[in-house]
Amino acid sequence: MKLYENYIENIKNVISREKVVKSMRYSTLEKGMSNFDGINTNALSERKLFSLKPLNSLEPLMQSRGKVSVQEQKLGEHPDFKHLKRTNGSEYHYITSAFIDIKNSTGLFRNYSPAVVMEITNTIQRAAIHTCVIFGGYIHRLQGDGVFVYFGGKGIQKKDSAVNALNATSFFTYFVKNDLKKVFEEEGIEDIYTRIGIDFGDDNKVLWSVAGIGECSEVTTYSLHTSLASKMQGIANANGIVVGENVKSVSFIDEVYFDWVKDSKGEIKKRYIFEDKESSFYYKALDFNWFNYLK
């Protein structure tokens, strides 16, 4: 898949520069590292580095989506609910939440300098952000190497929000499992992989309001299903996507793509991600077969 070619090229270029620096004599190394910062060594231009507009290799994906409006965003400010900022107000409205986590990136420090690790992890994170933006995602929060994203909003169908979340995370997972894996295999680096959790909360289950104080605040959601997205990420297998049963229901995607989350022995890890025995509420976590879905 050449959709992420620009991102892969950037990672390869940064790794190549690191090899050159390491091969230099100590005196030259000392001089070279003084200029070895994120901006000077990054293969991306400053405009592309700080823009939400995806890199050129993702253009075919954008075109397949039709007219995609890429607008600048602020973390913690979904445009449909940013009016709640600096208020005591709240509002109920559905949303699909997705938590994308990148695993094993700390192992890069065994082989590369902090500057190179920064460039590699930032490039991977940008690939996730750009992919989600193409599918209408709103970047809510960056958590370490991870990305927390909202899909949906006012004027967007509930089905579309869930399908867009599945599409975005499926493409990104393919990138990590295949394209990115090849780069690190060539370098003898331990696998970097992703784990993703997605859940949908309906209008009466998601409360939007402000968390924090002043500038140390964000417009966020208070919902069981927002919390469960992160929890489902935790039980996903390497390069797996785990979704709540609401996602299956609201997306209307064929049930053949959903199954119990199973371990390497084929045994079910966890049938219910949340249980409230007093209310007889048992909420399923399901593995989403993104690979077959993309075929």
List each model region and its residues:
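Intrinsically disordered, glycine/charged-rich C-terminal tails and inter-domain linkers
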Residues: 1-77, 238-295
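Catalytic beta-strand-to-alpha-helix segment of the class III nucleotidyl cyclase homology domain
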Residues: 13, 154-271
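N-terminal low-complexity, intrinsically disordered segments
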Residues: 48-89, 109, 114-122, 126-127
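Short secondary-structure boundary segments
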Residues: 63-90, 133, 137-152, 195-197, ...
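Short hydrophobic/aromatic-rich motifs at helix boundaries and adjacent loops
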Residues: 74-78, 99-102, 120, 200-203
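Short, mixed-charge, low-aromatic patches
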Residues: 76-88, 125-135, 183-191, 207-209
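Catalytic NTP-binding/metal-coordinating core of nucleotidyl cyclase/transferase enzymes
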Residues: 83-167
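Broad hydrophobic/π-residue packing in well-ordered secondary structure
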Residues: 99, 105, 124-125, 142, ...
